[in-house]
Amino acid sequence: ASFTADIADERARIAAILDATAPDRLGVRVLIPRLRGLEDSSRHWSVWMTLDHLRIVHEAVGRVMRSLADGVAPGRAASTADVKPSATVDGGVALPYERSCDDILATIAATAATSSRARHAHPWFGPLDVRGWHALVGMHLGIHRRQVEAILART
């Protein structure tokens, strides 16, 4: 429950930031200082790019969690290269990002009671089970919420 609460909290914080920000600032790519947990290759993004990345990650994590809940480790290794955003993404990403948040929460609810011991390796954290991937979602949102704040502090 605390992992899901973390997701809801970070999602709400990102939504509040978006609501309080002029849309023209959200598409500006800004080079930010290195943040803990953020790859150097992710430091020159816009807010829209950050939301696109979160959307891609939520979709990928959802697929991994559903597979693990079925007792099957996904065959393809998780890769940070696979979750890079489009450089040309715009405000049209806002709704797909929100849907991805809804979808990952639905996946979490559907897989929470799994007894599967299947694991899939995260590129940084190693093999994780369903619960480990669940825990990662809120932490990941928090890293990128701080990224959004850093981007907007420089626009």
Region locations from a protein language model:
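Aromatic-glycine hotspot motif
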Residues: 1-155
